[in-house]
């Protein structure tokens, strides 16, 4: 069978490589959905870049909003009729906390933060618009990372920060994790 999956597709590079190798070995088609390539404005941007209508691209900047913080809460009973073990999947079992389920992106074992959640959409757009689908960045760097205070919060992933990358063709990419939901996302 072929596979369609939502992000995050893996939580480690090793998991990602295992996925690719397994699909190749089985002859399985794998697709991770990011739902942005069918958006008219992104299609227009790609056409403009690939046809050279905006000149030489040297940097692509994008932004995801800051992650929430989840205050410590006590475990509670699992809601009736809900299979918490299935929701957890292969991650280490933890007592049920509704806020943890609602804010799954704020924990390493279920979401890995906003860069892995929403940043996936914008990284895909950079790859697609630049025509680098079958390659990827050759250098990575993170900076300005702000972590939640573990005394106040149970959330684990970065609240804000900056992800920079460089492609083999010399184009730079930057994804900022800052601002709110309605801020500009790609320029």
Predicted segments with their positions:
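Flexible, glycine/threonine-enriched loop-and-boundary segments that flank and lead into catalytic domains
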Residues: 170-185
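Basic phosphate/pyrophosphate-binding loop/patch that engages nucleotide-derived ligands
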Residues: 21-28, 43-58, 75-81
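Core domains of carbohydrate- and sulfate-ester-processing enzymes
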Residues: 61-100
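Beta-strand-loop-alpha-helix segment that lines the small-molecule cofactor/substrate pocket
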Residues: 1-38, 52
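Structural recognition of the beta-strand scaffold that forms the well-ordered cores
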Residues: 4-5, 11, 29-32, 58-62, ...
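Rossmann-like dinucleotide-binding domain that binds NAD(P)(H)
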Residues: 85-171
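Short, solvent-exposed loop/turn segments at the edges of secondary structure
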Residues: 23-25, 39, 82, 156-160
């Amino acid at each position: 069978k072929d596979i369609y999956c939502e992000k995050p597709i893996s939580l480690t590079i090793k998991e990602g490589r295992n996925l690719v190798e397994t699909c190749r070995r089985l002859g399985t088609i794998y697709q991770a959905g990011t739902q942005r390539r069918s958006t008219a404005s992104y299609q227009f941007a790609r056409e403009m870049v690939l046809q050279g209508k905006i000149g030489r691209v040297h940097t692509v900047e994008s932004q995801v909003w800051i992650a929430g913080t989840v205050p410590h809460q006590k475990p509670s009973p699992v809601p009736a009729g809900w299979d918490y073990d299935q929701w957890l999947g292969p991650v280490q079992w933890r007592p049920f906390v509704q806020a943890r389920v609602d804010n799954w992106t704020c924990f390493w074992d279920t979401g890995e933060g906003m860069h892995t959640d929403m940043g996936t959409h914008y990284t895909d757009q950079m790859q697609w618009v630049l025509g680098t689908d079958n390659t990827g960045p050759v250098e990575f760097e993170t900076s300005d990372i702000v972590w939640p205070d573990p005394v106040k919060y149970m959330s684990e992933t970065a609240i804000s920060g900056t992800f920079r990358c460089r492609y083999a063709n010399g184009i730079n990419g930057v994804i900022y994790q800052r601002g709110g939901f309605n801020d500009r996302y790609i320029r």
